[in-house]
C-alpha cells in the first residue's frame, strides 16, 4: 500500500494517531514488515514517531496525540479550561489523566513543541470527560467542571488562582455539576478544598449538596491558625497530595 492510500485509510478510521498494530491491520502485513514500512515514512518526515509503537500524521492536532498515547486517558485541568475558552493563557504543560502510567513526554510536530504530563490515577476517578470529534480524528477531554475537580484533587499541578478566575469570570461552569463530580471523587479533601474555595469566592447556597462530614465555617481565618493546625491545613491546601 502506498503512502497516500495508507493516509486515506487512517483518516477514514479517524486514526491520525495510531499504533503499530493499527498499521499492521491496515496494510495486512507481518509486524516486522510493518515496522520497516513505517520507518521509511518517519525518515522522510511523512510520519511522526511519538513513542515506541505510537505514530502520528504530521497534520495531527496536539490534543489528538495527547489522548492517544495510552488508553483510557483524557486532557484535564488548565488545558481543558483553555480548550473551552474559560482561561486565556495556554498552559506550558498538558495534564493527561490515565490509569496506567505517570510520565513526561516532549512532543514535536510541525505545529510546534509541547510537553505532556501523563498522570496515573485510580480508574474509579476516570470520569467526567467526553469525546470530541475533530476533522480527521478525535480527542478526549474533561468537562469544565471535572477539570476543576481534578485540579482540586491534585492542586500541585494547577495554581488555584486559575481555578478562582474560572469560577468568577465564566458562565460555562455548572456549579451543581461541579459538586456532583466532587462528591463522586470519593475524596474528603477534595470536598473540603471545594468548600473553602466557595467560601473565599462567596459562592453560596450549595453547602447542603457537598457531602462532607464537617462544614467549614464561612469566617474561617487562615491567618490565625495555630501551629498544631498548620500541618492539617497544608494537607488540605495541597502541600501534600495525600487524599
Predicted regions and their residues:
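Short beta-edge/loop segments at beta->alpha junctions of small alpha/beta modules
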Residues: 1-78, 171, 175-178, 186
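Short gly/ser-rich loop at a beta-strand->alpha-helix junction or flexible surface loop bordering the NTP-binding
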Residues: 44-127
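Hydrophobic alpha-helical interaction segments
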Residues: 129-243
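Short, surface-exposed acidic
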Residues: 33, 89-92, 206-207
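Hydrophobic/aromatic-lined pockets within catalytic cores
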Residues: 28, 85, 153-156
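Short, mixed-charge, low-aromatic patches
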Residues: 31-40, 101-109, 120-122, 136-137, ...
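Short coil/loop linkers at secondary-structure junctions
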Residues: 16, 30, 87-88, 204
Amino acid at each position: 500500500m502506498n503512502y497516500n492510500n495508507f493516509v486515506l485509510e487512517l483518516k477514514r478510521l479517524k486514526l491520525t494517531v495510531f499504533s503499530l498494530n493499527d498499521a499492521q491491520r491496515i496494510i495486512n502485513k507481518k509486524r516486522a514488515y510493518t515496522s520497516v514500512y513505517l520507518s521509511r515514512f518517519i525518515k522522510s518526515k511523512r510520519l511522526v514517531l511519538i513513542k515506541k509503537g505510537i505514530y502520528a500524521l504530521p497534520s495531527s492536532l496536539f490534543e489528538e496525540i495527547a489522548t492517544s498515547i495510552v488508553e483510557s486517558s483524557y486532557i484535564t485541568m488548565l488545558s481543558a479550561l483553555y480548550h473551552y475558552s474559560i482561561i486565556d493563557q495556554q498552559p506550558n504543560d498538558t495534564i493527561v489523566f490515565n490509569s496506567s502510567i505517570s510520565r513526561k513526554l516532549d512532543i514535536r510536530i510541525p505545529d510546534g513543541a509541547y510537553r505532556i504530563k501523563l498522570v496515573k490515577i485510580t480508574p474509579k476517578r476516570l470520569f467526567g470527560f467526553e469525546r470530541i470529534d475533530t476533522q480527521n480524528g478525535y480527542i478526549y477531554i474533561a468537562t469544565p467542571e471535572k477539570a476543576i475537580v481534578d485540579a482540586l484533587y491534585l492542586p500541585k499541578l494547577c495554581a488555584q488562582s486559575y481555578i478562582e478566575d474560572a469560577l468568577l469570570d465564566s458562565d460555562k461552569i455548572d456549579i451543581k455539576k461541579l459538586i456532583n463530580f466532587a462528591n463522586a471523587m470519593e475524596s474528603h479533601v477534595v470536598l473540603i478544598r471545594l468548600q473553602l474555595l466557595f467560601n473565599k469566592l462567596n459562592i453560596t447556597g450549595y453547602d447542603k449538596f457537598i457531602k462532607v462530614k464537617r462544614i467549614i465555617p464561612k469566617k474561617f481565618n487562615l491567618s490565625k491558625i495555630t501551629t498544631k493546625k498548620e500541618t492539617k491545613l497544608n494537607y488540605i491546601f495541597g502541600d501534600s497530595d495525600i487524599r
